[in-house]
């Protein structure tokens, strides 16, 4: 009996590609399924995919978004890419489904990530089941779903105070200027609202968001996370790091336990020159050792209005002072750093992957959200999971150095015992969910069984056991 064949299409951005690939690998390992991973040529040109080409039952299909070498920087570029994604992506999926339907391994189900609203329509055209792989928390999905159902009232959950405007995904706030993102979420949610019991695969775990995962009885929400590298759950640290790793790991080795502040805002978020200076001054004045990752964002899609300097150029005037207290690197293995005994605090933009990593590795945070789902993630970290302290902006939207120092001292001193105890609790629960045979593996098996039938999944699991023996 042929294994089920999943067509998994993902938006061409690192924050979408990484969890999607991890989901694909876990799906294959746990159920013996075949996965064809579909994305843009640019993903391969920009080296977003590594160490996946030799995975059995995992193959790749690419199409062009018109920007094969990247370089998207203007609104017009993004509009053009959106059109190309829809036209070329639709054709690539349709041609593949058509070409395989009478062969040994026809497509069983189509899985897609956010911002690809045309993908489930292809599945519907070919009468295939589809599922959305939601790479943000379940609560954020619920906020969007509730909003576009026409209920604009405040969304509430037990143990979480009412959401203020500052807690909402930025695309739903009155100050949102990204109409394209708002329209994309609206189209996606309106499609799902019309579906009968749509399946949403969510990068979370059962014990982290139990209320949010069961908020809508008409939606089949399946927790399949945390979608993080398997090394975390097996207990082995990934040592395949880049050139700078020896310098920062040796530096961390020289520090005492829980004494270092790790600062990283990911690859997409860029701080203004004023904000960079306030953060730098807070770190200098605090006199605690820190490791600050400042990446090259010269090819970023979103730039700070009126500023052409890179972040590394913005700190030039006080870099010497910074390096007297801490260390600045252009890249590090975040998982390796967060796993290090010396790290006691993570200053993060609260992207969902970074948020999950902080929970899984048990590191308290200073939540410094910027846009998209990050404000909601920060709310959850501070109030629901109680593993961090969130910064507050002034009336001009700037987080001042005094506020940053307040939060750092709270995490490193005043609330350190409470926050670390909570972080340990979530680390244990996350490990239980993410380990082989944990709740997320079981949820994944149930999803495949639901799609393909109970007898097929039993046969596949038995075949996998024989193969292992």
Curated annotation (Swiss-Prot):
Please give the GO cellular component terms listed in this UniProt entry. cytoskeleton; Golgi apparatus; perinuclear region of cytoplasm; phragmoplast
InterPro entries per record: UDP_glucos_trans, UDP_glycos_trans_CS
> Which residues bind UDP-alpha-D-glucose per the record?
334, 349, 352, 354, 357, 373-374
E.C. number: 2.4.1.-, 2.4.1.121
Primary location class: cytoplasm
According to the record's subunit comment, the protein's assembly and interactions are: Interacts with CALS1, ROP1 and phragmoplastin.
What's the protein name?
UDP-glycosyltransferase 75B1
Q: What is the lineage of its organism?
A: Eukaryota, Viridiplantae, Streptophyta, Embryophyta, Tracheophyta
UniProt gene name: UGT75B1
């Amino acid at each position: 009996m042929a294994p089920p064949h999943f067509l998994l299409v993902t938006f061409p951005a690192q924050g979408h590609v990484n969890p999607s690939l991890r989901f694909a690998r876990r799906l294959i390992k746990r159920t013996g399924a075949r996965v064809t991973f579909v994305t843009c040529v640019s993903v391969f040109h920009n080296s977003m995919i590594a160490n996946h080409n030799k995975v059995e039952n995992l193959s790749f299909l690419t199409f062009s978004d018109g920007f094969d070498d990247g370089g998207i920087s203007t609104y017009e570029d993004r509009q053009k890419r959106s059109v190309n994604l829809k036209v070329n992506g639709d054709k690539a999926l349709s041609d593949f489904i058509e070409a395989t339907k009478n062969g040994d391994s026809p497509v069983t189900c189509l899985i897609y990530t956010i911002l690809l609203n045309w993908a489930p329509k292809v599945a519907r055209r070919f009468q295939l089941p589809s599922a959305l792989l939601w790479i943000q928390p379940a609560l954020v999905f619920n906020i969007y779903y509730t909003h576009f159902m026409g209920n604009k009232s405040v969304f509430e959950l037990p143990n979480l105070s009412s959401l203020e405007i500052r807690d909402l995904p930025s695309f739903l706030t009155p100050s949102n200027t990204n109409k394209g993102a708002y329209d994309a979420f609206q189209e996606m949610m309106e499609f799902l609202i019309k579906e009968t019991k749509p399946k949403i695969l969510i990068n979370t775990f059962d014990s982290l968001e139990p209320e949010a995962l069961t908020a809508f009885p008409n939606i089949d929400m399946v927790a399949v996370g945390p979608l993080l590298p398997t090394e975390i759950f097996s207990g082995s640290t990934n040592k395949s790091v880049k050139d700078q790793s020896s310098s920062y790991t040796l530096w961390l080795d020289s520090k005492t336990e829980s004494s270092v502040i790790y600062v990283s805002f990911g690859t997409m978020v860029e701080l203004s020159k004023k904000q960079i200076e306030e953060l730098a001054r807070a770190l200098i004045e605090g006199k605690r050792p820190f490791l600050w990752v400042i990446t090259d964002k010269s090819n970023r899609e979103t730039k700070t209005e009126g500023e052409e300097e890179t972040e590394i150029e913005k700190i030039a005037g006080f870099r010497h002072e910074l390096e007297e207290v801490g260390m600045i690197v252009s890249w590090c293995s975040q998982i390796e750093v967060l796993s290090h005994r010396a790290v006691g605090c993570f200053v993060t933009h609260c992207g969902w992957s970074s948020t999950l990593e902080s929970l899984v590795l048990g590191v308290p945070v200073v939540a410094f959200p910027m846009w998209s789902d990050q404000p909601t993630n920060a709310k959850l970290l501070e109030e629901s999971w109680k593993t961090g302290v969130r910064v507050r902006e002034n009336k001009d939207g700037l987080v001042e150095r005094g506020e940053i120092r307040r939060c750092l001292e709270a995490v490193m001193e005043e609330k350190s015992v409470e926050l670390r105890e909570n972080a340990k609790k979530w680390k244990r629960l996350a490990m239980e969910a993410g380990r082989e045979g944990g709740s997320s593996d079981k949820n994944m098996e149930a999803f495949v069984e639901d799609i393909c039938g109970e007898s097929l999944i039993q046969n596949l699991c038995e075949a996998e056991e024989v193969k292992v023996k």
